[in-house]
């Protein structure tokens, strides 16, 4: 399943295609959404927000389209009039004069009023989004030490969207390697330096992944690019200590770690 950085990049692509442009055609597959089709014609998308792995497409008439891709949903951007060759089932079409965005295969789709937006069960449940620029390491540290989360092993906590929205398995793996901890550690057992390092890594690594993953750095001395240090690298030497990276299963997900420097 895509994690927060991939969802945010998808939102960026949708915004770049249709933000601020009048909608010329709107289509929803689900009967309960059909009545909104005519209400959205002539309106425009003001912005696309991410809340962890959910997308909120906000319209100029104050309605918001909530969508969660789960495992199979995918958004695509096409030139208006183009019909992609795909076996996927179309769920949503938002068309402007030059670009159209299409949502395929997703089943968790709703239209929300401003009032419903504040009471939606999933949105009520998720924690702060790791890509929210207003989220600070100090707030993350407070959450780590809160009674709700301080006694939970990181193996499960870092996959729990109620803790921080947008984290997923590859981020869990890379964050714990970065700070030299294992999935069995708990926040209550960390010293001040470990806690501070973890709070920063929980924000820095997702943000670096969002900003640079998949890019090629032609200027070797300019900034840092995200790359996997341990994820999917079992059997290879750890670049930090030379130990051999291992693979196991934690919280029903593949987990990669270095026994030499994560303890």
Swiss-Prot record:
Keywords, sorted A to Z: DNA damage, DNA repair, DNA-binding, Glycosidase, Hydrolase, Lyase, Metal-binding, Multifunctional enzyme, Zinc, Zinc-finger
Zinc finger FPG-type: from-to: 229-263
Cofactor or coenzyme needed: Zn(2+)
InterPro entries in UniProt: DNA_glyclase/AP_lyase_DNA-bd, DNA_glyclase_Znf_dom_DNA_BS, EcNei-like_N, Endonuclease-VIII, FPG_cat, MutM-like_N-ter, Ribosomal_uS13-like_H2TH, Znf_DNA_glyclase/AP_lyase
Active site as annotated: 2-3, 53, 253
GO-annotated molecular function: class I DNA-(apurinic or apyrimidinic site) endonuclease activity; damaged DNA binding; oxidized pyrimidine nucleobase lesion DNA N-glycosylase activity; zinc ion binding
Keyword Metal-binding: yes
Annotated cofactor note: Binds 1 zinc ion per subunit.
Disulfide bonds: none
Known catalytic reactions: 2'-deoxyribonucleotide-(2'-deoxyribose 5'-phosphate)-2'-deoxyribonucleotide-DNA = a 3'-end 2'-deoxyribonucleotide-(2,3-dehydro-2,3-deoxyribose 5'-phosphate)-DNA + a 5'-end 5'-phospho-2'-deoxyribonucleoside-DNA + H(+)
CDD domains xrefs: EcNei-like_N
Transmembrane segment boundaries: none
SMART domains, A to Z: Fapy_DNA_glyco, H2TH
Superkingdom, natural source: Bacteria
Chain residues that bind DNA: 70, 125, 169
Summary of the function given for this chain in its UniProt record: Involved in base excision repair of DNA damaged by oxidation or by mutagenic agents. Acts as a DNA glycosylase that recognizes and removes damaged bases. Has a preference for oxidized pyrimidines, such as thymine glycol, 5,6-dihydrouracil and 5,6-dihydrothymine. Has AP (apurinic/apyrimidinic) lyase activity and introduces nicks in the DNA strand. Cleaves the DNA backbone by beta-delta elimination to generate a single-strand break at the site of the removed base with both 3'- and 5'-phosphates.
PANTHER family: ENDONUCLEASE 8
Family affiliation: Belongs to the FPG family.
HAMAP family: Endonuclease_8 (MF_01253)
The protein, known as: Endonuclease 8
Source species of the chain: Escherichia coli O127:H6 (strain E2348/69 / EPEC)
